[in-house]
Amino acid sequence: MANKRRRKRKLKPLTKVLMVLIPCFVVVGVIYSIDSNKIQDNKIEETKTDTKINNDNIVKDSNTQDNNTSVDDSEVDPNDIYGILESIAKTDYRYKEVLANKDIYPEKLLEMLSRNKDMISYMYDFEDKKGHIYIDNIGKVTKGEYPLLLQYDKKWGYGIYGDNVIAINGCGPTSLAMVVAGLTGKNDTTPYDIAKYSYEKGYYTEEWGTKWDLMSIGIEPFGIIGKKIVLSKQNLYNELNNGHPLIASMRPGDFTTVGHFIVLTGIKDDKIIVNDPNSRERSAKLWEYDVIAPQIKGLWTYSLAS
């Protein structure tokens, strides 16, 4: 009996210890569980945040690509033309109006617009202004500098040249107008003036467009001399370095898929400066000789008539 009492006394301290320790383990377990949940929540939240950031970057990149779509004047399938225009029309009401009235435009103009957003202002006023010329000079001119003139400029681009408007057919006259301005320092010869003269003198045919003869003997009445030269890197660089602008007739390539005239105005960083009468974008670039030379099928150098 006495032994049983002693065992009970020994068990009491152990029971007290357990009564203290068990709640502690429970509390620690609860805290650990809470912390574990917090860690998991944080991991999930971090994953959501990372995913959101990546999606935002994708959207921004996509928008940047849409806003900087590079376009040119090459021939495309009519279905592609309208697909491009309809895509742009989603964010530009002017394109919607052009498409709604597409029957008033030559197919070539719609094609050009699909490759050159800079033309939208010209297109928007086409029906009202076709056939009209709105200026008799090209603006301020500095002798020795060659202004970039665009064949679709609203000041003369609605004028008729041959079987269509200067915006479509006028790359040759527009190129010559740049050369005349730079060599003479005068601003009173517009692309329309040269186009009108070219047509009246038989330098334009509906089948072939502007004849090469306009680039040489045809331009003499405007106070400059044009001479056809053999294409070589030495010839091209010598002429430009001596202050003689060049006009090039282009094969299909970066500038056209049919035929086109551009002006070569100088050399910078050993590259060629180009004035393309149908593209601000291409005119803003410097061109490697090895890129541009294979596309040239005719080349003329110019100087001021004595």
Where are these regions (language model features)?
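Conserved active-site-adjacent core of cysteine acyl-enzyme catalytic domains
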Residues: 27, 31-37, 72-87, 97, ...
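N-terminal Lys/Arg-rich, disordered targeting/topogenic segments
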Residues: 1-14
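Active-site-adjacent structural segments surrounding the nucleophilic cysteine of cysteine proteases
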Residues: 13-18, 27-203
